[in-house]
Amino acid sequence: MLIRRPADEVYQAFTEPGVTAWFWFTHADRRLTPGAQLTWTWGMYGVATRVLVKALEANRRILIDWNLDDAPTEVEWTFEERGPATWVEISNRGFAASDAGMKAALEAMEGFTLALAGAKIWLERAIEPTFILDRFPDQVLPSWKPKL
């Protein structure tokens, strides 16, 4: 996905939870730092996942393991400067070679696609996307209060 913002700004959007919470998860217990274990929460669904930060290369790469408690997989973001814009790719690997693994891979691909689209609209237009919130409207907790 091409995001028309500088690489440092796009990279920070995925490493600083105060920014990421505008377009993807709703809370993280800390920012990404090498070797850190943290929790990302999607409050609207009452869902969280534990994350291990394996590598960070400022403005170039993020490598994590996530879903540490249930079928962990590796996720890698790469950031490539293209003039005043940044090309971002997300790879998610390590799924089981089974029907359940295939289903999990497809669901993850959908989620990361929404996260990239959300990052693009937030960073380029300062519009809070509600893609993640609106993906499963029937599963949103009745007590959830969006930032809108």
Mark where each language-model region is.
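A structural detector for beta-sheet-dominated domains
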Residues: 4, 33, 41-43, 80, ...
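Residues at helix-coil transition
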Residues: 15-16, 25, 58, 117, ...
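Glycine-rich portal/gate segments that line the openings of hydrophobic small-molecule binding cavities
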Residues: 21, 27-68, 74, 147-148
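Short, highly charged C-terminal tails/helix-capping segments
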Residues: 121-148
